[in-house]
Amino acid sequence: MLAMSPPKPAVELDRHIDLDQAHAVASGGARIVLAPPARDRCRASEARLGAVIREARHVYGLTTGFGPLANRLISGENVRTLQANLVHHLASGVGPVLDWTTARAMVLARLVSIAQGASGASEGTIARLIDLLNSELAPAVPSRGTVGASGDLTPLAHMVLCLQGRGDFLDRDGTRLDGAEGLRRGRLQPLDLSHRDALALVNGTSAMTGIALVNAHACRHLGNWAVALTALLAECLRGRTEAWAAALSDLRPHPGQKDAAARLRARVDGSARVVRHVIAERRLDAGDIGTEPEAGQDAYSLRCAPQVLGAGFDTLAWHDRVLTIELNAVTDNPVFPPDGSVPALHGGNFMGQHVALTSDALATAVTVLAGLAERQIARLTDERLNRGLPPFLHRGPAGLNSGFMGAQVTATALLAEMRATGPASIHSISTNAANQDVVSLGTIAARLCREKIDRWAEILAILALCLAQAAELRCGSGLDGVSPAGKKLVQALREQFPPLETDRPLGQEIAALATHLLQQSPV
């Protein structure tokens, strides 16, 4: 008899979902359940929309055309055709599709917005979103084609096609399924659009929010790796822990700096390989004057690690605060206020400027942190700077074996590529017959941020492989004197990646380790 998989934990959606819960649902680790109060809000919202329709109110996208065609009034008998045509003309995306988790994060973001009860979406539409999230499927959504201004119209239109069985699905391993096969395999009912369902589904910042959600999750893992690897670097280079003292961070109390310094200190606890004494405790006499073999302070890539890492962590924290608000916000237009004070409100909650700016800021922080890791690799592999380790950490005869020389150059190339693109949000371009005369480009910002996160992961993977080699070269295969945390880290790496005894191709190992770093924090 086949063993049954344990049921997934349920995340109950009312007014608020946090980023960890959202990622659990998007990544298939939890199922989503609509809380009774949210269901009641959505039913009330649908009822308010019904009253608007019966009273023939002048409401954008319900009794009007779209965008600059909003001055064309539409009769009630054409509402279904209007909604269908909205999806048809918007489903114009191109480029590679969003990955499985990111596409599901987009679906979840749309559901959370609609569940606030101000969009008038039908109960059946909400059920189709929930069913898709609780399946093992994702919509196949082209990644390019949205300016993130009237929300993410284009990618969300492709989501609607998928829900209708007219677009493709992705299964968990990325295999593409046609609409009919996806509906069958997921045991899904095809979506039937009514009233303004199409506009409620496409008009919002859900694609950029979904991408940003996955970005945030990846950055948390990579940030943990950056701390762990910096601590191990200190052990390999006989680094000084004085610069990580709590008293320094107390005098400059940025939360990220304090956190980074504390975690660095914890990682080297029990190490005999770092220098712990305070320089100023030494008293000089006449015989001490002159040049010492080593400076009393480390280079900035070690000494200033709490400040550099901490600034990045504070940027991520700001990104996460903004993202949490955006995820739980109503980003539709028009909206139907729950208090019923007016039939509908027309505005611009679909403008993705918050996600655009925070994604650009996070991309900048990621590039800075990748630059720190690249400089750490350079110092570790340079025999003039690595305090007695062999050049490029080779084990065989120098010259015959080049060690990590190629990998070090790859790290430099990756960083150069990260620096080749700047912020997206400053490049607003008027479009849509000047109706959208300013646009956020938030989805582009989030996508570019993701590309930089992937490059950072690859640089950290190179650093990790170099450090495992350096630790064994410095301390022997038994890792004598290395901290317990450092030993666990090297041993975990060695379970998958053997020492570089002689030169071998490293590209596949770097890629595999980078994927691991994005998904799991260090031991």
Curated annotation (Swiss-Prot):
Active site annotation, chain numbering: 60
Covalent link 5-imidazolinone (Ala-Gly), residues: 149-151
Annotated transmembrane regions: none
The entry's keywords: Lyase, Phenylpropanoid metabolism
This enzyme's EC code(s): 4.3.1.23
PTMs per UniProt: Contains an active site 4-methylidene-imidazol-5-one (MIO), which is formed autocatalytically by cyclization and dehydration of residues Ala-Ser-Gly.
Enzyme class: lyase
GO biological process, alphabetically ordered: phenylpropanoid biosynthetic process; protein homotetramerization; tyrosine catabolic process
Xref: Gene3D superfamilies: Fumarase/aspartase (Central domain) (1.20.200.10), Fumarase/aspartase (N-terminal domain) (1.10.275.10)
Residues found modified as 2,3-didehydroalanine (Ser): 150
CDD domains listed in its UniProt record: PAL-HAL
Recorded catalytic activity of this chain's protein: L-tyrosine = (E)-4-coumarate + NH4(+)
Binding annotation for substrate: 89, 303, 432-436
GO molecular function: identical protein binding; tyrosine ammonia-lyase activity
InterPro entries assigned: Aromatic_Lyase, Fumarase/histidase_N, L-Aspartase-like, Phe/His_NH3-lyase_AS
Protein role: Catalyzes the non-oxidative deamination of L-tyrosine. Has very low phenylalanine ammonia-lyase activity (in vitro).
Family affiliation: Belongs to the PAL/histidase family.
PANTHER family: HISTIDINE AMMONIA-LYASE
Subunit structure: Homotetramer.
Protein name as it appears in the record: Tyrosine ammonia-lyase
Gene this protein is translated from: hutH
